[in-house]
Amino acid sequence: ADMLINVVDASNLERNLYLTLQLLELGIPCVVALNMLDIAEKQNIRIDVDALAARLGCPVIPLVSTRGRGIEALKMAIDRHQQNQDIELVHYPRPLLREADKLAEMMVTDIPPRQRRWLGLQMLEGDVYSRAFAGDAAHKLDVALAHLSEELDDPALHIADARYQSIAAICDAVSNTLTAEPSRFTAAMDKVILNRFLGL
């Protein structure tokens, strides 16, 4: 893909940003369409769009799609945007990055480095579909997981929790609403369980 358009529900920013972070980690140019701002405003939710764009390292365009507000600005952003800023969006535990990078080194070189690391993390998280693109690295996954088991009890949970911590920090900086810490941890657990047992 040359460009990713990520439509985010402004009235439920924290939940929607999980996918946003995953897309941005791919390193593919991305434009975030911040939709349903009218609903967010009715719920007294305020979002600093410029601050959100700075945190994500990509354009964020406010939209009210039902009224056609922001559509032209979105088209313009799509035409002009060429590359996301190189920002470390998620602070993963070092053992996870170490094993993800080892897996990435075994993948074909025509896959960009950031996408190889992303695939490595997805594999460690338990995403079976990522193995189809990983080449020889797929055969070394068990070794990587064995190494991790000596330092981390559950790689998938640590990956999800790191992402939710980043999301919480972003929401705290750009919005007047923030879910409590226990709820974020529960959401991380839910994400892992859904991924493993429902294929979501």
Q: Can you name each region flagged by the protein language model?
A:
Residues A1-I61:
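Conserved C-terminal guanine-recognition region of P-loop GTPase G domains, centered on the G4
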Residues A160-A162, A188-L200:
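Hydrophobic alpha-helical transmembrane segments
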Residues L26, A54, R114, S183, ...:
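Short flexible coil/turn linkers enriched for glycine and charged/polar residues
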Residues S175-V192:
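Cytosolic juxtamembrane amphipathic/interface segments immediately preceding
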Residues V31, E41-A180:
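Alpha-helical transmembrane helix bundles of large polytopic membrane transport and channel proteins
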Residues D2, Q165, S183-A187:
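Alpha-helical membrane and juxtamembrane elements of multi-pass inner-membrane transport
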